[in-house]
Amino acid sequence: MKASRFLALAGLVLLFVVGYASESEEKEFPRELLSKIFAVDDFKGEERGCKGFGDSCTPGKNECCPNYACSSKHKWCKVYLGK
């Protein structure tokens, strides 16, 4: 559900960028705008304090995010369904 919302929002943003760039009179503007949007050189991701689905973990430690548990068999965070 969240993924479909994200994809819809990303599609709308991309549509807006393309529409705005096509209306621009400068020929270099679309290329500059897209290069700034998709530039990953300056992007430094924030590290989370917990591990998400599929991340490796150590059983017995509380490393996984809420609603996830460290699988003692596979040694990665999985969805905790409770018992």
UniProtKB/Swiss-Prot annotation:
The modification Leucine amide is found at L81. Expressed by the venom gland. GO terms for molecular function: ion channel inhibitor activity; sodium channel regulator activity; toxin activity. The presence of a 'disulfide through disulfide knot' structurally defines this protein as a knottin. Negative results: has no activity on Nav1.4, Nav1.5, Nav1.8 and Nav1.9 sodium and calcium currents. Residues 22-48 form a propeptide. Disulfide bonds join C50-C65, C57-C70, C64-C77. It comes from Cyriopagopus hainanus. This is Hainantoxin-III 5. It is found in: Secreted. Residues 1-21 form the signal peptide. Belongs to the neurotoxin 10 (Hwtx-1) family. 15 (Hntx-3) subfamily. InterPro entries: Huwentoxin-1, Huwentoxin_CS1. GO terms for cellular component: extracellular region; host cell presynaptic membrane. Keywords: Amidation, Disulfide bond, Ion channel impairing toxin, Knottin, Neurotoxin, Presynaptic neurotoxin, Secreted, Signal, Toxin, Voltage-gated sodium channel impairing toxin.
